[in-house]
Amino acid sequence: MNLSRTSRTLLRAALVAGLAVVYVPLAVVLLNSFNSDRTFSWPPAGFTLRWWSAAWGSAGLRDALWTSVQAGLGATVIALVLGTMAAFAVQRYRFFGRETVSLVIVLPIALPGIVTGIALSNTFHTVLGLPLGLLTVIVGHATFCVVTVYNNVLARLRRMGLNLEEASADLGADTFTTFRLVTFPMMRSALLAGGLLAFALSFDEIIVTTFTAGAGVRTLPIWIFENLFRPNQAPVVNVVAAALILLSVIPIYLAQRLSGGDPQTH
Amino acid sequence: MTTITTTAASPGMRRRAASFLHRHAGVRLSLLLSAPLAWLGLAYLGALAALLVTAFWSTDVFTGDVVKVFTWANFTDLVTGEVYRTVALRSLGVAAAVTLIDLVVAFPMAFAMAKLASPRAQRWLVIAVLTPLWASYLVKAYAWRVMLSSDGLLGWGYGLTATVVTLSYLWLPYMILPIYAGLERLPNSLLDAAGDLGARGWRTFRTVVWPLTFPAAVAGSIFTFSLSLGDYITVKIVGGKTQLIGNVVYDNIGAANNLPFAAAVATVPVVIMLVYLAAVRRTGALENL
Amino acid sequence: MRSPRPRFARPSLVVTAALALAAVAGCGGGSSPATGGSGAAPGGGAFTPPKIEALKSLGAGEGQVNLVAWAGYAEDGSNDPKVDWVHPFEKATGCTVNTKTAGTSDEMVNLMKTGEYDAVSASGDASLRLIASGTVAPVNTDLVPNYKDVFEGLKLKPWNSVNGVPYGIPHGRGANLLMWRTDTVKPAPDSWGVVFDPASPYKGKVTAYDSPIYIADAALYLMSAKPELGIKDPYALDDKQLQAAVDLLKQQKQNVGEYWSDYTKAVQSFKSGDTAVGTTWQVIANLVEADKAPVETALPKEGSTGWSDTWMVAAKAKHPNCAYKWLDWIISPKANAQVAEWFGEAPSNAKACAETSDKSFCDTYHATDEEYFSKVHYWTTPIAQCLDGRTDVTCTDYSEWTRAWTEIKG
């Protein structure tokens, strides 16, 4: 590739600068979690670990975290199943309305969250008469999480081709066995990447959740939203955010590691 | 493809099901499509349709109950009210600005990641880009509020500009990742070939790189555009006295308890996004999400 | 939710029920007021509530009580282990408390209509709707021993009673105040005119509450600034009066730097000097002062808008005895002091002032100052029937106020 030295340096500089800009606010958040001033004023007034211990002891926070995890897992599982099915259908078959399927899958995430939120809430409550709760949250999240799995699996299927599956069939494996022993292992990393992104989307989602959660269900973003307004609790929120940032590196790293580990297709 | 069956005496249920499925592609297809389409096609689209229907109803002023009588009143108010036009255009402008900024910022970053970094570094770079997505959206917006306040790190103040900057920041990873994926797929040999033919950096970019990664860029833009168009939280945090169309919808649902009007207002961003999606379908961006 | 006041446009999460339930036309008891003519009479200034009997006598506790409350009203230690008045109640009465936190008044009304809850902490707008729809019953104050210690200024008010019959127990009250930075705003203002001044020297540094209900604040100012408009009640505005208020607010917008709807935003704004003058709550003022920023607050001479919440008992409560016990508990001196301090409002029980951990709490919040509160116009939802009793015009309702607010913000 013949990029001049200046181009290369400039591009690298852009990358570094960009990442720096991305991480400065996160550093501010981290700093504020130690800030003894409750309203995040700058520069930080003093250093304290009070908020970290308060966060540790807060039962409300723990419940919210658990609810978010449950919602995320539920939504991810559903998204994995639906996304994979749709991806297989679109990639492997030709049928009328194929393009529309892609469009419909993208729609929940392409339309503004507030629209999805009020549409789903209206349906649940008015049309179906369902009480709003964790289940409706999971349904709402799954709806827009499908697309991440769908795209990852689709991309992988495109690269994979049918050769190995045909070979497996030639060797006598039936449809289910082929899927279990050949197709699935080849798709693992795509599923993982898609699932991880779906979980992240669900974990941090607030707008659709606001409308589908009802009064009793409190996910982490909802808890954060509520507590950002309480002077005594707001710094604890920073702690939560800081902790999330630090902890999230682990699953992301794992996902990246595992992406390289798929059996090669050629 | 023929299945060479073994010489087992009578194939079991599972085997029979498997062969049936294998031979009847149509059945396989419908089974595969059934659940996703039921969920997204029927349920989700149905929910949207139900919402649209509500837009044609009205609210009883005293009891607050919805009156299920067809009326154009909501849409008439929407179209004739000057403020709604202003807010809609403003939201459109914000979404476009955010998309443009993110595109300009993300492309060089993604290019450096895809082409100039070693495979090992690439993995860490992707992690570095993904990690901020896990920091709560709200907290990031508040961090920006802190930085933008007059005694904060940046001190630029709140308002429309602050909103655009914050939104650009929040959605940047959503633009970087698809472009990075697209650039990764771009074979280096093409770039070498362009160089061999005499094209320098900018020419190569304009004639080779950009056209090929255009779908990926558009894919990223779908996220940034849509997320900015409907957002009502960030603008409340850093927007000063600005309001966007998401706020109008939100205010009408909660405070005013006027779902029909809120639904009518909500059709505006929906229509915009549908038009956008229709336009980008041809570019193949939908496969690049 | 902690932030006590922005019921109307609080960036609250639980909007779902509000929108969905509102869309339920005629579902359950939704539209009952109109039936039988005993509900709210359109066009009349007052209304005749449905005939419901208050509880005659208190029996044994049923073992459980289901509440609908604002966040922070029924703390059980899950947010801060030291902030808990629910567990002591459960120990004392044997009634287990299940609280459903609501985000808006609309949601509270709808939750109560389901019949699943026994008591609700209703704001001035919700309370009337609940009474009119027959969702809540009158309260027999003889069964609430602590009621006698409630400030007289809160008893039998238009939002918690009808025709002399009390429908609830006052929880607390607070006023929206004028706050200013003493280093930038001189001389010290005593009138809302300082935020409505078109030629304000504080351009870009004025703040206002981000909710349609703020229109009442403008109307309140116009009551004395433009008496020819004939505004008697800032929540009862006919088209002309509403337009005048809207014009005033549009003019104010030129000078507004930021509209606020949550605590930390307002506190930070004043602290950093981004805002120099505007509407505030006592608790915000306390926080700003605690962080050493130079501010002062005052209740301007025109008076102010404010709020007062009422605990009400459901007409079809499944656990009425425990509900009454809760009502008595929450206004008992110690619990009332605790919730007032946690929330940031004036307690309703006079004896609570002796129980606050901050000994000057009641003074700061003007709990015993009836003169102070006589100038407060408590939040009420504007409805088409004029709240000031006029029958010759139709007043503007809250959905019109919301449209107007959208227009004002532009």
Where are these regions (language model features)?
Chain B
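Glycine/proline-centered hinge or cleavage motifs at structural transition points of membrane proteins
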Residues: L197-G198, P211
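Juxtamembrane helix-boundary/capping and inter-helix hinge elements in multi-pass membrane proteins
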Residues: A117-R120, S150-D151, E184-S189, R200, ...
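Membrane-water interface segments at the C-terminal ends of transmembrane alpha-helices
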Residues: R28-V61, T76-E184, L212-S228, Y232, ...
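A short amphipathic helical element positioned immediately N-terminal to and/or at the very start
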Residues: S19, F70-T80
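Short amphipathic alpha-helical coupling elements at transmembrane boundaries
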Residues: A73-D77, V126, S149, N188, ...
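Transmembrane helix boundary and interhelical loop/hinge segments in multi-pass membrane proteins
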Residues: K68-T71, G182-D192, G201-R203, F214, ...
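C-terminal transmembrane helix and the adjacent membrane-cytosol boundary/short C-terminal tail
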Residues: T3-R15, F20, L31, Y180-L191, ...
